[in-house]
From Swiss-Prot:
GO biological process: translation
Protein name: Large ribosomal subunit protein bL21
Family recorded in the similarity comment: Belongs to the bacterial ribosomal protein bL21 family.
Organism (species): Mycoplasma capricolum subsp. capricolum (strain California kid / ATCC 27343 / NCTC 10154)
One of the record's GO molecular function terms: rRNA binding
InterPro entries referenced in this protein's UniProt entry, alphabetically: bL21-like, bL21-like_sf, Ribosomal_bL21, Ribosomal_bL21_CS
Length: 100
């Protein structure tokens, strides 16, 4: 059984037992979370979501991704600036997919 959920402005295909990386959400490690915006379950397509469907998961880790370097550079001018950014993420283990 699989489902497509919408979280953090993205659509993610999930299955029970799978661990996924999503945009940071509030919560501590081992907190239970429920995803309510289910777009599809096993080929049943929602309009736009499936009413009463839920995907339950557990937060495994809150962390930050690898640092990326952003360089601002203007030729022929004395402007050369380097910025760093680490995107926060949440690692979630999918426990259960239920359709009403």
């Amino acid at each position: 059984m699989f489902a497509i959920i919408k979280t953090g402005g993205k659509q993610v295909k999930v299955e029970p037992g799978q661990e996924i990386f999503i945009e940071k959400i509030k919560g501590e490690v081992n907190d239970k979370i429920a995803f309510d915006e289910i777009l599809m379950i096993d080929g049943q397509i929602g309009t736009p979501t499936i009413e009463g469907a839920k995907v339950l998961g557990t937060i495994v880790k809150q962390g930050k991704a690898k640092k990326i370097r952003v360089i601002r550079y203007h030729p022929k001018k004395n402007v050369n600036k380097i910025y760093g950014h680490r995107q926060p993420y949440t690692k979630v283990k999918i426990e259960e997919i239920s359709a009403k």
